[in-house]
């Protein structure tokens, strides 16, 4: 099955699945995605100029390659030419309508969800965008790896699987991976200046935002008042040259509300504050767990606000696209725990580790909470262009202490552009699940709530009940119990581990479970002094 939001080209001709035929083959194609440079691809590959749907260019290019006996080049098209986020499945049948090949592929960050069975068993092949799509399937189900294309060749009696890792963003190496023309003339000896780094980051961020402003439906912007979402909204407003619609979600006295209000006033947006009470937040947790298909503590906490604001946008506006600010905390190593990093190399490598796993956590949260309400989420600051640009910085210059604030290199490129109020541009990191709350933190409200939802006896036997990533708190136990009620105990391993702070205050890797809220860290109070 396929549910289409019709963000690009809402005509009947763009309904999926797409079916393309010639004398030798039939191609059936399904894609959950947005291909932002589809018009450039139409021109470059000399495709039919009547194509209006962005996703349709992919099977059309594949058909063209097949007709030229060059289908082996399809992976290079995805790797080097396509700009966007996607999860797609392509079926190729021969002229006798016998299935010959299945190709499945996911963007290299994993913005769009895709699950699959790692081995072909029970005489079936499962590919689904949600766990809910395979509730009756008894075998192992896992995340389809981002940045991979898997080709199932069925032309012979035995199915042959060819898995290709096409991702390139993790190959980025500082400091000499940009400015290729200069490198060619100076034999790799050139060290970019600060101004060149700042300019490159400014360009990459702007490009990443602008790519995601193309839509046939109105766009909403989630605005927490943090530097990430504020930059996205401010740059979009400047590019579009019109007042945009911004939304902030929180409880009364939530710290995000004031900062978001200041940004909205600065950029002149139509701003809406979606206020919820602790009781309203607690009431949606069961459906949040079902929606995001996760038992991870911090993911559930942060999902509540995003779930509530997305519900509001869906019910009270005509917006269908939602731009969010997720990504820089992982890319730019800006979680407050990174002040504890033992050295620059450890910090730089941990950024790659966080981004490689972001599809299990923040990306899953954003995609599911938004799409739950018939909306499409877009994540500009996880664009590979921006990631490569930022990761070209030397590791030591990404350390929070380098300039006395986390992600200085993301803030500084826009310091002289009069985009944002100074206090917003330099606002310290505040987790989404913390920023929605006021004097009493959201995680404390939840912990009080679950105190009588999980018994002491249940906690005493937690290791026996849930031996995989055993819940260490009543809050974690409550989420796990909900997850297993919806999806069964066999699906727990969909999530590889709890999201955890990387280091403790002594620069040692964290062992065992610690609360993921930044407000529990000593560095939180230190950076507010």
Which residues does each PLM region occupy?
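N-terminal glutamine amidotransferase
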Residues: 1-29, 34, 72-192, 206-210, ...
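Short secondary-structure junctions
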Residues: 47-50, 156-163, 493-494
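Active-site loops of AMP-binding adenylate-forming
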Residues: 62-68, 129-134, 289-293
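ATP-dependent adenylate-handling active sites, centered on carboxylate activation for C-N bond formation
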Residues: 93-96, 101-103, 111-114, 118-120, ...
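Short histidine
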Residues: 21, 31-96, 222, 228-233, ...
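Short, polar/flexible loop-turn hinges at active-site or ligand-entry regions and domain interfaces
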Residues: 44-50, 68-69, 134-141, 192, ...
């Amino acid at each position: 099955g396929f549910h289409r939001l019709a963000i690009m080209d809402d005509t009947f001709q763009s309904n999926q699945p797409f079916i393309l035929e010639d004398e030798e083959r039939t191609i059936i194609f399904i894609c959950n995605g947005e291909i932002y440079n589809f018009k450039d691809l139409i021109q470059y590959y000399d495709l039919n100029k009547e194509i209006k749907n962005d996703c349709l260019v992919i099977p059309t290019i594949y058909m063209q390659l097949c007709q030229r006996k060059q289908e082996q080049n399809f992976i290079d098209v995805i790797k080097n030419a396509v700009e966007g986020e996607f999860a797609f499945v392509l079926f190729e049948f021969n002229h006798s309508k016998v299935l010959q090949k299945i190709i499945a592929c996911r963007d290299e960050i994993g913005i769009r969800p895709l699950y699959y069975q790692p081995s072909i068993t029970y005489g079936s092949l499962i590919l689904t965008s949600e766990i809910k799509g395979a509730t009756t399937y008894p075998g192992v189900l896992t995340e389809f790896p981002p940045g991979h294309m898997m080709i199932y060749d069925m032309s012979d009696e035995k199915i042959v699987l060819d898995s290709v890792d096409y991702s390139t963003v993790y190959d980025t190496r500082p400091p000499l991976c940009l400015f290729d023309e200069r490198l060619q003339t100076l034999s790799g000896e050139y060290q970019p200046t600060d101004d060149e780094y700042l300019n490159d980051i400014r360009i990459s961020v702007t490009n990443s935002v602008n790519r995601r402003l193309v839509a046939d439906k109105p766009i909403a912007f989630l605005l927490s008042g943090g530097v990430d979402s504020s930059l996205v909204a401010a740059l979009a407003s400047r590019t579009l040259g019109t007042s945009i619609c911004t939304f902030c979600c929180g409880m009364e006295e939530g710290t995000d509300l004031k900062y978001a209000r200041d940004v909205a006033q600065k950029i002149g947006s139509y701003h809406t504050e979606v206020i919820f009470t602790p009781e309203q937040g607690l009431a949606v947790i069961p459906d949040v767990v079902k929606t995001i298909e996760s038992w991870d503590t911090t993911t559930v906490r942060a999902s509540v606000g995003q779930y509530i604001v997305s519900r509001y946008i869906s019910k009270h506006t005509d917006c269908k696209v939602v731009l969010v600010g997720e990504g820089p905390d992982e890319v730019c190593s800006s979680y407050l725990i990174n002040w504890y990093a033992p050295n620059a190399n450890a910090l730089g490598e941990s950024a790659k580790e966080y981004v490689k796993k972001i599809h299990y956590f923040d990306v899953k949260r954003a995609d599911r909470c938004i799409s739950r309400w018939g909306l499409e989420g877009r994540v500009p600051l996880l664009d590979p262009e921006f990631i490569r640009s930022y990761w070209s910085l030397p590791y030591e210059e990404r350390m929070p202490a380098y300039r006395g604030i986390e992600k200085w290199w993301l803030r500084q490129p826009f310091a002289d552009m009069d985009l944002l109020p100074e206090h917003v541009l330099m606002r310290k990191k505040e987790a989404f699940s913390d920023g929605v709350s006021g004097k009493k933190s959201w995680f404390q409200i939840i912990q009080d709530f679950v105190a009588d939802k999980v018994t002491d006896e249940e906690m005493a036997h937690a290791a026996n009940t849930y031996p995989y990533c055993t819940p260490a708190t009543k809050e974690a136990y409550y989420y796990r119990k909900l997850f297993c009620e919806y999806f069964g105990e066999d699906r727990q391993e969909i999530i590889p581990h709890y999201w955890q702070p990387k280091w403790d205050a002594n620069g040692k890797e964290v062992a065992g479970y610690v609360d993921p809220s930044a407000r529990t860290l000593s560095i939180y109070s230190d950076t507010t002094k």
